[in-house]
Amino acid sequence: MTQDELKALVGQAAVAYVPDGSVVGVGTGSTVNCFIDALAAIKDRIAGAVSSSVRSTERLQALGIPVLDLSQVERIPVYIDGADEIDPRGHMIKGGGAALTREKIVADLAERFVCIADASKRVDVMGRFPLPVEVIPMAAAQVARRFGAAYGGLARVREGVVTDNGNLILDVTGLHIADPLAMETEVNQWPGVVCVGIFARHKAAVCLLGTPEGVRTLNF
């Protein structure tokens, strides 16, 4: 199966985790697009969606799925999103689509995070995929230097990208993230950092992993 076919497979499988009558949290990215397309088939059974990005909002609305403002929702039963990497404990690197801050906000509302990914995203230790960090523009160089000093990482500004919040993305390479929760906690305290793309506090409860043999369900 191709990577696109694996994404479609887990996108379809994730629909089973959406309770009838609920508001569902929707992430961002190519795998999530497959979930949105599958969600359209049951749009009459749900109350709507809360979206983590402008791109996802536009796709949801184009398919006739109501999108609610975050202020209208106190809790949601499930948040469905992809990952750039996921480790054996359900910790993730996210933010390849530059929507990490809003993704983390929506994930914080959810009772359960269901990650959808193809098998290539499963790793033993995170850090091979560049770690995205949303930063206030004036702090980009300062935060980049700090990554080098603290972790030996090389941080570069992602060219041509401005987040939905008007900020920049640093992509940090050369990391070995043995303790995701500790790194997430520390980096989020650095001045100028809006959000780091480590999801350890908001880790996955379930991962639907697309494999050539079908969907593999990992519970954390």
UniProtKB/Swiss-Prot annotation:
Record: residues binding substrate: 28-31, 81-84, 94-97, 121
Short name of any one Pfam family annotated for the protein: Rib_5-P_isom_A
Reaction it catalyzes: aldehydo-D-ribose 5-phosphate = D-ribulose 5-phosphate
Active site (catalytic residues): 103 (proton acceptor)
Enzyme class: isomerase
Gene3D superfamilies linked to this entry: 3.30.70.260, 3.40.50.1360
Keyword annotations from UniProtKB, A to Z: Isomerase
InterPro entries registered for this protein in UniProt: NagB/RpiA_transferase-like (IPR037171), Ribose5P_isomerase_typA_subgr (IPR020672), Ribose5P_isomerase_type_A (IPR004788)
Keyword Isomerase in annotation: yes
Pathway: Carbohydrate degradation; pentose phosphate pathway; D-ribose 5-phosphate from D-ribulose 5-phosphate (non-oxidative stage): step 1/1
Superkingdom of source: Bacteria
Coiled coil, from the record: none
Entry's Gene Ontology cellular component terms: cytosol
Keyword Isomerase annotated: yes
EC number: 5.3.1.6
GO biological process assignments: D-ribose metabolic process; pentose-phosphate shunt, non-oxidative branch
The protein's role, per its UniProt record: Catalyzes the reversible conversion of ribose-5-phosphate to ribulose 5-phosphate.
Self-association state and partner proteins as the record states: Homodimer.
Protein name listed in UniProt: Ribose-5-phosphate isomerase A
Organism, scientific name: Leptothrix cholodnii (strain ATCC 51168 / LMG 8142 / SP-6)
Lineage: Bacteria, Pseudomonadati, Pseudomonadota, Betaproteobacteria, Burkholderiales
